Amino acid sequence: MRKKLFGQLQRIGKALMLPVAILPAAGLLLAIGTAMQGEALQHYLPFIQNGGVQTVAKLMTGAGGIIFDNLPMIFALGVAIGLAGGDGVAAIAAFVGYIIMNKTMGDFLQVTPKNIGDPASGYASILGIPTLQTGVFGGIIIGALAAWCYNKFYNINLPSYLGFFAGKRFVPIMMATTSFILAFPMALIWPTIQSGLNAFSTGLLDSNTGVAVFLFGFIKRLLIPFGLHHIFHAPFWFEFGSWKNAAGEIIHGDQRIFIEQIREGAHLTAGKFMQGEFPVMMFGLPAAALAIYHTAKPENKKVVAGLMGSAALTSFLTGITEPLEFSFLFVAPLLFFIHAVLDGLSFLTLYLLDLHLGYTFSGGFIDYFLLGILPNKTQWWLVIPVGLVYAVIYYFVFRFLIVKLKYKTPGREDKQSQAATASATELPYAVLEAMGGKANIKHLDACITRLRVEVNDKSKVDVPGLKDLGASGVLEVGNNMQAIFGPKSDQIKHEMQQIMNGQVVENPTTMEDDKDETVVVAEDKSATSELSHIVHAPLTGEVTPLSEVPDQVFSEKMMGDGIAIKPSQGEVRAPFNGKVQMIFPTKHAIGLVSDSGLELLIHIGLDTVKLNGEGFTLHVEEGQEVKQGDLLINFDLDYIRKHAKSDITPIIVTQGNITNLDFKQGEHGNISFGDQLFEAK
């Protein structure tokens, strides 16, 4: 239960990063536009006082500000896409749900344009709708609900007369209904929740702000290895605290308040839960990287210089620290704990110095320059002496403990592992293999710095192999694996997903995707489309076109072309003379290769992987030669119909170079064992 919850929290944390990724662009526009309108920059660059330049500056400020004004809706769309595997239908559903929920709440509570002017009411105008202000939390709730609707109903079947509304078209319909229902409990409960959040945040800040900011920095850093820090900091940045802008609107959240104050040129009061990152990311961690380099063995220093130099520069410029942190987290956990304490102390130090710095992405130099130096609204220069002190502390603490405790940080290993030589194009295949292959992957995801994979059997994961491929660290919690590949993690995930979906079939391999419950038998390049391959019916039943299979992986021919049979008997027989190439462990799918070189996948039913082999009896084994008509598998047809999504059985040619299939008896009608099903050319 705990491991399953951890996996779900990881996915939510990753989903929150999609809307957050938009903020740097918005912050760039807002910061430059605001700075160009400020007296400080105009004093040094008088030409920007030109009317045309000032018009552009105002437009930039407005363009950046509109993103922050609509963060709840952006979070609704981003969370929906993130939790629904990137499908845009979920975003449409989230938008529909968001406006319906707000409109229904507004009408139910009788909110009008007049009473939204009272800040104490908790009302606001959302996309022109007078309604209850639920903030970013409201957007996250709607996004999660839209993702649930998508995952639940994206492949739903309806009667033929309602066929137009089946599948993905049904998702926004369900979302409209569920968000309408959700609006009523939200209207009744949310004011109490918001009051509680306000009271908690006020009490937290008023009781002992110094302790609060220290604990925030300390805990947030400790959560980074688990990927849960996004969930932890979200309420601090987007909900806790309040400030009234010039228009009388109440703004919640440390980051939102900071951005609004920058936009209005107001006195800064926010930034307490962000600014502590700057000394650590710009000075402390790069100094730690230098200590790791200096303590490396002489023969390894050249390699370590490249690794640590890149990680240090990434931390300094962008504030992305995981590649550097994971280089010592597992081999020297004490160093990471000290690092977390120093991070908390950095927050406390800048708070005591009465600084007010913020960022849109992270505590690197880019945000420091755009939102600290350019606006010139706080004593930003104090970060530099604090940072230099931090650099000295980090360097000597890390160097002393690495040598004293003989930590095996990069370059100090007893035997330098042989680095894998996978090229950029080969890397996703190598990572997939190191994760145990497609059959071992239950859920695949990534965030800015780490590949997040939930596996079926972690004993099949080659952790040293992942590190050899460039992962600076691999975290294991239950069956959840996190491989730290830095900023290229998302690209690796995207390419792995393409391989698993059968969209890319280089590097021949056999894989299973539990999400779509499908098997890919990779194309054998030696097979040629110039040959003619006869395929006989492996089952008795009703022939159905692949386009009518209620699973988009098959219906959209992502796996390859073919046909499906709705069986009337529980037997699968060999459709040609050949060999058994692959049998999936749960016995629901079998891959065959004919003597003429045709590769065929027979996938018994849909979602049958979840049956874990129950109801299936094998009569062959991998590598066995078979003759056309030999019994391959018996299956309990009644059991499958009762416990699986469907008994319909796709029969797929998995070679992309074979696209011409001649269905001898058509794509409809009944067929029996041994009848000619199709000819592949």
Curated annotation (Swiss-Prot):
Domain PTS EIIB type-1: 425-506
GO MF assignments: D-glucose transmembrane transporter activity; kinase activity; protein-N(PI)-phosphohistidine-sugar phosphotransferase activity; protein-phosphocysteine-sugar phosphotransferase activity
InterPro entries reported in the protein's UniProt record: Dup_hybrid_motif, Glu_permease_IIB, PTrfase_EIIB_Cys, PTS_EIIA_1_perm, PTS_EIIC, PTS_EIIC_1, PTS_Glucose_EIICBA, PTS_IIB_1
Active site: C447 (phosphocysteine intermediate), H603 (tele-phosphohistidine intermediate)
Reaction catalysed by this enzyme: N(pros)-phospho-L-histidyl-[protein] + D-glucose(out) = D-glucose 6-phosphate(in) + L-histidyl-[protein]
Cellular localisation: Cell membrane
UniProt keywords, alphabetically: Cell membrane, Kinase, Membrane, Phosphotransferase system, Sugar transport, Transferase, Transmembrane, Transmembrane helix, Transport
NCBIfam families registered for this protein in UniProt: EIIB_glc, PTBA, PTS-II-BC-glcB
Name this polypeptide is given: PTS system glucose-specific EIICBA component
Species, as recorded: Staphylococcus aureus (strain bovine RF122 / ET3-1)
Gene that this sequence comes from: ptsG
